[in-house]
Structure formats: structure tokens, C-alpha cells
């Protein structure tokens, strides 16, 4: 009676041993396309859109900026238009992840780290603080690639040593505003002027650079800059009122994002005290500055967008590409604002303007 039972046991153990042997020698399972597509490992600087699409997913591009105001918004619009013109359509061939720190510099660190954790193929930064945050989040991995715009000086910001000496995963276009030329318009339009009010945020490396340019340039023109520092946009109006009380005869604002984000507060004080407002961003004239001479930020966005396209297509060698300087700019005049602020604009200056706002 035991022999049949023994035979059955032997047969069962034989099948079991065969199963074990088969399992041991079977090749390791390979990830499927679907599994590979959901892997969010941060790409290196050599990642291309072709690599990402081949993995079965749309490439992700992170766009980050310090705050929303016309110049920075124009930069990002230029980038997105350049991407779209090259076939990188949001939701169709690429996923654009946009993030705005709403003027809070520490928030940029969180945004940059999230982009890295999300495995974006590329980060586009708008403003100097955004570039610094993205650089700090990517420096250990040396990627993903970064394209920067609206940066006064990547050198003073501690990102690059020279135009051809920069991190192998970081590239962009320097947007150094024509501070000296904009200041020169003040005594030209206001002969005899002596003091000009100037507000900036020292936490913005770009503003420190502009201030270091503005102070000696103003002195060379026979002007004294009355300088006030702020730390956030809510302080702009009080700072402007304090400068007006100190007897300044005009205001000048460069490309400080903290100030420009709350430009209307400065314009209010300028209008109430008949103090002409001169600016370093043409878009500021549309908001109420009397005279604005500066760079074309939409064009700068298009140009940096072209760099982003080159990276996504795997055609741009970042390490061997030099940082260029944006030189395309224009003069804008707001005649209604000038009249409100007590400034007369002669015809020869109007003739030089790319944009004249009548009312």
C-alpha cells in the first residue's frame, strides 16, 4: 500500500526540482516600455528629446521665474514661442512645467529641486535668483541642462567665470541692461537736475551689479543717486515716499525684479509728486514710466528658446558654447505719463523711440 504513495511522492518531488532548476537559470525579467516610461531618474546634460521619446514618454521642460511682471513674462513667452515654432508643443510633443515663486527667493529652491526630482529634460530659468537656485539643485548631478535668461551677469552671480568658462550643463544669454545710456537721458531731458531716487533689492545679484554700474555712471553725469534698499515688493511705495520727502527730482529704476513687480506703487508716488520716472525696461513705459530705455526681453526669450531647442534636439554642445550678451533693445516713451510727472519730451527724442504712447 505504501509503494504507490512513495511513487507519487517521488514524482511530485521531481516536478518540484525541475521547477526550481528552471527558475534559477531563467534570464532576469526586463522592464517593459511602460515601466521604463514611468522611471523618473533625473537626466544628465547629455539627455536629448529623442532619448526621452524613445522611452515612451513626452520630455518635460521646467520653466521657473522669480515673479511675474511684463519683462519676465515676455522672456517666458519668447521661450515658449521658440519651442512651439520648432515643433515642441505643450501637451503634444513636450510637457511644460511652469512655476512662479511669486517674488519669494527661497521658494525658488523648492521649485528647482522639484524639477530635478520630476526628471525634467531641461530647466529654463528667468531671472538671476532662479538661475542660482537651479544651479544649486543640479550641481551635484551636473544636470539636467539649464538655459538661463533675464540674467544681468552670470559672472557676478557665481555661475560662470567667463563667457567660455561655465558649467558644462549651463548656458544662456547675458541680459545686461544699458544702465549708463538710460541714466544719460535724465540730464538730457532735465537740464540742471542734481538728485535721482533709486530703489533696489540687494538680495538680487543682478541689482547689485546694476547699482555698481549706476552709481559711478550717475556721478560722471553730475548726478547724485539717493539710494534706498528694500527686501520685498510691499516696501516699494514707502521707499519711494521716503525718497520724495528727501527731495529727489526724479526716479530711476533698473531691472530689479522686486521693484518692477510693484512698479505701479512707484508710479503712484511719481505722479503725486511730479517726479519723472525713468526706467531700464521698455515695458515699464506701458505701465506708466515716462521714459524707458532697455533690452527687448521678448527677443531675449526667443534667442534663449533657440538654445533650448538645440539642447532638446541633441544638436547643441553646451560645454563648447559661449555665453553671449543680448544687445537688442529699444526706447519707449509714454507722453501721458511724462505730462503727469511734469516732464516735457522734445521731438528729437520722440523720433528715436521705437514706441511712443500718446495716452
Please describe what each predicted stretch is.
Residues 9-17:
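Sec-dependent signal peptide recognition
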Amino acid at each position: 500500500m505504501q509503494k504507490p504513495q512513495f511513487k507519487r511522492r517521488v514524482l511530485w518531488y521531481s516536478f518540484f526540482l525541475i521547477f526550481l532548476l528552471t527558475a534559477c537559470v531563467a534570464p532576469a525579467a526586463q522592464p517593459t516600455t511602460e515601466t521604463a516610461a514611468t522611471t523618473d531618474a533625473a537626466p544628465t546634460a547629455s539627455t536629448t528629446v529623442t532619448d526621452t521619446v524613445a522611452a515612451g514618454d513626452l520630455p518635460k521642460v521646467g520653466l521657473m521665474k522669480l515673479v511675474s511682471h511684463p519683462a519676465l513674462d515676455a522672456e517666458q513667452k519668447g521661450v515658449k514661442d521658440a519651442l512651439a515654432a520648432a515643433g515642441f508643443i505643450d501637451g503634444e510633443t513636450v510637457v511644460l512645467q511652469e512655476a512662479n515663486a511669486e517674488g519669494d527667493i527661497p521658494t525658488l529652491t523648492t521649485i528647482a529641486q522639484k524639477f530635478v526630482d520630476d526628471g525634467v529634460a531641461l530647466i529654463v530659468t528667468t531671472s538671476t535668483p532662479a538661475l542660482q537656485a537651479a544651479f544649486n539643485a543640479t550641481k551635484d548631478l551636473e544636470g539636467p541642462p539649464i538655459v538661463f535668461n533675464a540674467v544681468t551677469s552670470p559672472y557676478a552671480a557665481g555661475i560662470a567665470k567667463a563667457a567660455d568658462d561655465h558649467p558644462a550643463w549651463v548656458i544662456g544669454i547675458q541680459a545686461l541692461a544699458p544702465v549708463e545710456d538710460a541714466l544719460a537721458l535724465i540730464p538730457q531731458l532735465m537740464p540742471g537736475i542734481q538728485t535721482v531716487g533709486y530703489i533696489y533689492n540687494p538680495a538680487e545679484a543682478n541689482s547689485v551689479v546694476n547699482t555698481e554700474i549706476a552709481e559711478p555712471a550717475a556721478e560722471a553725469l553730475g548726478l547724485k543717486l539717493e539710494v534706498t534698499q528694500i527686501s520685498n515688493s510691499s516696501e516699494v511705495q514707502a521707499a519711494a515716499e521716503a525718497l520724495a520727502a528727501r527731495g529727489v527730482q526724479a526716479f530711476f529704476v533698473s531691472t530689479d525684479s522686486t521693484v518692477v513687480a510693484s512698479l505701479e506703487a512707484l508710479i503712484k508716488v511719481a505722479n503725486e509728486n511730479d517726479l519723472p520716472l525713468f526706467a531700464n525696461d521698455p515695458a515699464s513705459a506701458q505701465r506708466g514710466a515716462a521714459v524707458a530705455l532697455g533690452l527687448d526681453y521678448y527677443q531675449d526669450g526667443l534667442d534663449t528658446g533657440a538654445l533650448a531647442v538645440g539642447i532638446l534636439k541633441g544638436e547643441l554642445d553646451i560645454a563648447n558654447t559661449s555665453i553671449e550678451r543680448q544687445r537688442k533693445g529699444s526706447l519707449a516713451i509714454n507722453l501721458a505719463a511724462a505730462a503727469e510727472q511734469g516732464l516735457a519730451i522734445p521731438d528729437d527724442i520722440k523720433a528715436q523711440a521705437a514706441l511712443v504712447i500718446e495716452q
